């Protein structure tokens, strides 16, 4: 017969295992997506703007990153009230403009995910700090959680199969170097 103290330890261990196994935590348990990882299938709400849906090449109310026709996707996780994201916005608007005016047009696409943001908050954000590229809502942080709950801004460069080719935490300061990196990653 087991001693009561040993039974309690075993019971606590079993409870801990079940809690970890069934906590609903998905995505990266050990951190953020890294180069070489494949992103989970994220079902995202389509942007409200017809122009943004046309740019992404999507027609439905929801889509997955793999539905976007491009060779490389810049996928930026932002926060509606994130001051660093506000600082990065004009830099990425410049990057978007350079991509769209050059030979990379159509080959590289850009998309932002507003972690915790709903459609009304995105409209507020766009009134404060215009973005040249689409922003999609993630009001319940579902996609954000699947991505390991990164601090914002968090930028990923992803191929059409969802393979992560590069990640960057924080503001991308050197747009020229980042554009070169992106150009080098496009087959």
Identify the role of each PLM range.
Residues 69, 77-94:
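Conserved redox-active cysteine motifs that mediate thiol-disulfide chemistry
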Residues 74-75, 110:
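Hydrophobic beta-strand anchors of alpha/beta hydrolase catalytic cores
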Residues 20-54:
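N-proximal helix/coil linker or "cap" segments that precede and/or mark the start of modular domains
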Residues 11-20:
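Bacterial N-terminal signal peptides
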Residues 125-131, 139-183:
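Thiol/disulfide oxidoreductase modules built on the thioredoxin-like
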Residues 86-129, 142-144:
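Structural microenvironment flanking redox-active thiols in thiol-disulfide oxidoreductases
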Residues 2-12:
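Bacterial N-terminal signal peptides that target proteins for export
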Residues 44-73:
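A short beta-strand-turn-helix
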